[in-house]
């Protein structure tokens, strides 16, 4: 027996009375199991069908999904050959993608292709189950969050708590900013979030690294969204889940693709999937426009360093960061691409790797010529011996530009355009760029100027 499905299933919303602590729920350490089947056409075109019986197999579940959405599935035994929806058949003629069954084991993160007979699979034995249209070794959009919990079927959200600025920006970009009831104290974008935090209309739930579980619980949220690589976020969400509160842990922002996946996940978990896919399309279109501009111009492969300070031994963007991905998108090379994550590096490596451009991301300075001059004059001998210093190619991103560059959020296209303007001189020259950029960063954007998702 199947529950009534929808694009993202609308289930009965649990009305929370009093505090969340009073909800009758039994805490469990058992890994959550799949409650339905996912159909992923690629490009974030995804459908979900909830089931009541975890013993159902993926074949019968997909048949039910296709019946509900007036789709037609063509099978060769238990192998899915094609799916037709809205008079279009997938895969299209000449497309190398094929339908496969993908499974996400309980207690783990990541799809694996099923090599067994799909009819022998019990959906309830896995955290998530997906029929995905993929090419080669490509995988479907993640079906679980950063804690291995499937985020489909949560139902409509009406009260949201965000535990991080990047989460807040993503929630707002997917159209749900008006129902945020709690946020971390550093969430300041869009501007209306900062205003509501200052008046108490949105309750501060603490800092990024020390959110208050009690404060979050008292807000009776439908869903709490945090960052999966923050142990304190995971701890808070684990307690909330034990009391019946839906939670989503976003993946660390290690690439542009991960940011887009997070955007989809947030929208799907809140039942704002349509808006989230529209947001993703806008970001992708802008990134493609930037790519086209770079391809049409005389791009150069320069060496770039992104630093979080002017310290002699600074913290820099390593290879597994969205910032490094942005450098690559600008057709340049991150001199610390062999490092992992954001990492403190030895001072001697700065001159030895000799960056052509240095981008300092720091709110320790103001956005004036004097502040910039003070920053440059304070640089160590190691920094002064670089090509970037000799050629006057050291940029300062401060004030609002610091947030833009330091948050893996839906403003990633704006950061990418700004990066290209800094490191690809002569290509995007329709706006004159100063050496220090702050709250005025939008003044230097043309392709992505309206992609701040401020409303």
Language-model segment annotations:
Residues 1-29, 153-157, 455:
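Short, low-complexity disordered leader/linker segments with a strong preference
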Residues 25-153:
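Ubiquitin-like/PB1-type beta-grasp interaction modules and other compact soluble beta-rich domains
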Residues 158, 204, 254-270, 277, ...:
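Structured C-terminal subdomain patch of bacterial secreted/periplasmic proteins
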Residues 159-219, 223-233, 335:
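A short, structured surface patch at a secondary-structure boundary
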Residues 159-174, 275-333, 422, 434-454:
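Basic- and aromatic-lined ligand-binding clefts that recognize polyanionic substrates
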Residues 184, 317-342, 362, 393-396:
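His/Asp/Glu-enriched short active-site or ligand-binding loop at hydrolase and phosphoryl-transfer sites
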Residues 212-221, 243, 345-354:
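Short helices/loops that flank or line small-molecule/ion binding pockets
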């Amino acid at each position: 027996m199947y529950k009534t499905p929808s694009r993202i299933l609308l289930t009965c919303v649990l009305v929370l009375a009093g505090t969340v602590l009073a909800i009758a729920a039994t805490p469990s350490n058992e890994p959550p199991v799949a409650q339905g089947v996912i159909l992923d056409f690629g490009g974030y075109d995804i459908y979900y069908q909830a089931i009541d019986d975890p013993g159902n197999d993926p074949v019968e579940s997909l048949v039910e999904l296709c019946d509900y959405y007036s789709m037609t599935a063509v099978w060769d035994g238990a192998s899915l050959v094609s799916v037709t929806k809205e008079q279009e058949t997938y895969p299209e003629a000449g497309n190398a993608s094929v339908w496969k069954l993908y499974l996400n084991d309980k207690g783990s993160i990541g799809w694996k292709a099923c090599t067994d007979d799909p009819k022998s699979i019990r959906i309830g034995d896995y955290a998530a189950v997906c029929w995905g249209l993929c090419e080669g070794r490509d995988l479907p959009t993640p079906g679980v969050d950063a804690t291995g919990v499937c985020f489909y079927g949560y139902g409509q959200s009406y009260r949201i708590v965000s535990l991080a600025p990047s989460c807040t920006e993503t929630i707002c970009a997917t159209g749900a900013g008006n129902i945020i009831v709690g946020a971390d104290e550093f969430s300041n974008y869009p501007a209306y979030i900062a205003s509501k935090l200052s008046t108490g209309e949105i309750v501060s739930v603490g800092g990024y690294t020390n959110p208050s579980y009690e404060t979050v619980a008292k807000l009776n949220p439908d869903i709490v969204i945090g960052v999966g690589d923050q142990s304190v976020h995971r701890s808070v969400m684990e307690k909330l889940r034990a009391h019946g509160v839906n939670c989503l842990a976003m993946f660390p922002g290690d690439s542009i693709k991960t940011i887009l996946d997070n955007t989809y996940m947030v929208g799907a978990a809140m039942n704002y999937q349509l808006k989230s896919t529209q947001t993703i399309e806008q970001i992708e279109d802008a990134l493609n426009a930037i790519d086209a501009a770079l391809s049409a111009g005389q791009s150069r492969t320069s060496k770039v360093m992104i630093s979080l300070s002017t310290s002699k031994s600074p913290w820099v963007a390593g290879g597994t960061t969205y910032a490094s991905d942005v450098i690559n998108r600008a057709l340049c090379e991150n001199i610390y691409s062999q490092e992992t994550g954001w990492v403190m590096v030895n001072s001697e490596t700065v001159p030895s790797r000799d960056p052509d451009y240095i981008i300092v991301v720091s709110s320790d300075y103001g956005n004036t010529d004097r502040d910039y001059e003070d920053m440059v004059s304070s640089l160590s001998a190691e920094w002064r011996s670089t090509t970037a210093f000799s050629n006057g190619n050291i940029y300062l991103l401060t004030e609002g530009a610091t947030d833009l560059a330091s948050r893996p959020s839906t403003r990633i296209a704006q950061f990418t355009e700004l990066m290209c303007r800094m490191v690809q001189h002569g290509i995007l020259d329709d706006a004159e760029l100063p050496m220090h950029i702050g709250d005025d960063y939008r003044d230097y954007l043309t392709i992505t100027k309206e992609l701040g998702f401020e409303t």
